[in-house]
Amino acid sequence: MNDPGDIPLTHTSTPDSRPPCSIISIIPTIGMSSCRGRAEAFARSLSSKLRTLGSQTTEEGEGNAEDEPIINGTSTNTWVNSHDSEQTVTDLQPLRHESDSFFDFDCELESPGSPVDECEYLRLIETASNTPHNSTAESGYACASMASSHSSSNDGPYFDASASTSTAAAAQDQTLPASEHKEYVNTLQLNGKHGLANGVQEEQPAFQDDVQEDEAFLQAQILNELQKHSNSLTEVEQTKPEEGKLTNGHLEKVEELELKDVLEVAGTTNRAPKVIAAPQEVEAFADRSQEQSPNDRVQKESSQERVPEGTPFEGVQGESPSDRVQTDASDERVQEEISNDTVQVESNHKSATESISTEVTTLERSPEESRNDELSPDSGVDETDKSASNLTVDVDLAQIEQAKQDATEAVEKSGAPSRGTTVDTTDDEDDCRPQRIRRCSSLKTGKTPPGTPGRKKIVRFADVLGLDLADVKTFLDEIPTIPKSAFEDLEILESEPPLQLGPKSDKLLMPLFQQPGGLPKFLDAVREKQVSLENAAVTDNINQTISGSVRVRNLDFHKSVHIRYSLDGWRSYADLQANYVENSCDGFSDIFTFVLFGNSLHVGQRLEFAVRFQCKGQQFWDNNYGANYCFQCLPSSTHTAGGSTASPPSVATGAVSTGHSASLVGLLSPTAGDAWCSSFY
């Protein structure tokens, strides 16, 4: 099935002057025999390629018949049957944007009937069939990639790219005819402008001989310069044997790495096919090369890295490892120039001139500069090798310097006794010298082992000097007498100053009850009434603070104690909750505490209170058997030395006159006055 604009296989639109691209012309070059089955597979692949090219030419314009690629000029050179032309052809391989691809014949053909033979046909027909008639050359390499993942399983066999290269070694150095040396072209439309063409135009026979001569001339010049530079560096190496020994361990590793780079340069120079383009085609290529996409440039670099290592130059094999290390910078530049010459097809003569001039400039530099270039980032040497080389040299130099210093110190130490005069020291001279004061200790310091020779120790006993060996002192049990002279410097105050206890209060609170906790039957009272005041006293005479404690029966875990007090004879009252004392339970009773403030009382007033105990929904009272617990506010007593001023009657001081005794009893009596409320409880 053909779409409108597709080119049929049985006739041609325009005559083609090129030789027909037939299977007969390809097989002798590769050294294979024809087979009908492989030919049919080849025809299917060719039909797929023609379908792809037909769709591209339809986009550019169907009326341009001269631009349509014609592969087989006549119907006699095709193997496509009538039913094959009506079948739907799938895409064998998508269009690639690689501008730098190459023939890769380094695969081993297992046998003449191996599936690899068909793969070779597929690769060659991709090169021949995907190039338009008027395409412009752009690269010096031919396409060598396999069918893409988009191709059908029936279009071509599977090819194992990791096969060995024993059988294809014979076909490696063969060159295709000029009519078959074409490359697959990828044409893309960019915003309605002219398309990008990646590929190689067919070689023109007029320039083929010139290309070979230029390549031979370029290789001869490079080898000659490399040989001269190697000889000069060998002489320099012989004059500096010590420097070579210092870095010999590192240079051997670098030589092995750089040898591979030199061989890659040689293989690239020997086996890379190049094409000379016509002047008008070179100009068209220059315009299109500037419009290459980043993807094309990345694929170009990957294609250059895939160039296999070919047969190295004989001159390179004859070089010594040290020469290859020294000339690494030159080889890197030569490889760069050769790669640029392969990608760019402007002029081989100009590229050769630039390569030779660069080589001569490199050879004129000193060996130290060449060595620095080897370790520079531009030379391609890994940063790890650079740092390792610097570290090796630094360590070796440091070891040499340390050895020299050790030798110098050893000589100085051995020669010091001979140059100086030996001085004999005696014990007498040691005694004349001022001895250093040392801290006496009966313990060994542990710094020197016992038996180590040192200073002589001189021991003198007291009896030798006429002194007593022992000094006896007697201690008596009696209290020693202190002489008066020991107190002469002491100042004894005859009169003590009065104590300053703060401001004095003009009133005081006097309890009118006896403390229940001091009574012998206190616990019996607690057992009887379930609650009882234990004690209550004034703790602060300035603020008139009363602190007290209450003991209650342990009837239940939940219990509460309140103090009900009044300052105006029970005309009004207030309740104060007492606080439980932690860990006060003895199994029989618990203790609660409270604090009352009577600073608002005036002289002659009373503070009365009673205790209420609540437990299990019941209330228990302690009101001092109906008399309540009272504190009387009295004026404070002031005594003078002359006694001219009589203090008011006070219960605390007992200075109560006989005439006022009856009235005082009535004042202190809990039953006197209208303030008592007997029906309160």
From Swiss-Prot:
Ranges annotated as biased composition (Acidic residues): 59-69
Residues recorded as bearing Phosphothreonine in the entry: 545
Residue ranges occupied by any CBM21 domain in the UniProt entry: 525-632
Positions where Phosphoserine occurs in the chain: 547, 549
Compositionally biased region (Basic and acidic residues): 237-251, 297-308, 321-336, 365-374
Keyword check for ATP-binding: no
Chain positions covered by the region annotation Disordered: 1-20, 53-94, 232-251, 285-391, 405-435
GO cellular component: a single term: protein phosphatase type 1 complex
Keyword Lipid biosynthesis among UniProt keywords: no
Biological process, per Gene Ontology: negative regulation of glycogen catabolic process; positive regulation of glycogen biosynthetic process; regulation of glycogen biosynthetic process
Biased composition (Polar residues): 72-91, 353-364
Pfam families recorded: CBM_21
GO molecular function (one): glycogen binding
Protein keywords: Phosphoprotein
Name assigned to this protein: Glycogen-binding subunit 76A
Native organism taxonomy: Eukaryota, Metazoa, Ecdysozoa, Arthropoda, Hexapoda
